[in-house]
């Protein structure tokens, strides 16, 4: 018998967690290899601590949807690693406005369900959180964009997360992830459509992105927030066309 209160050798714990056998077979193997007779309750305890890693399929969604989700996470998401009695929990959260962003939350939920994890929406005061637990997704998501540049869909996701409609433009502000702000500014410069940027007194940087710039760079095609400008222009003109083409 293993002495009461004494932790089992690491090799024994690894065998319990990895061997796909009956409790009786595990008991016999441990006794044969280490001369320790362990109770079934001990096997049950360590088996509950096995990593519950569920597969995700990033190929199940379009490249544009995945880029959009990454941009949204970079702007308005966070991830935490919680250690509980039964192992680690890899939590991803996207925080959105309860009044203004239900369509964004709906798109976010659709993408997550298609990839594989089971997300849920949690009310938090005036906000809603899209929350999901997934080890694979936890490591796939980064707050900083790729140094190789970002796509129109990625910029659209960031705008949907941290942008605001300002008449016929989007104002985007970002202070916590300077690489995101820099990456979006670089995207517009590379598209030959530079945007106005400035800093407030507390070094909070802001960016002003006109509607025509959003349209020219195709960001408009993917941003739910930017599409509100199109709808506003349509109401102002009485239609979604100005007679010379689509707004």
Could you tell me what each predicted segment is?
Residues 1-247:
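Internal intein/HINT superfamily modules and their associated LAGLIDADG
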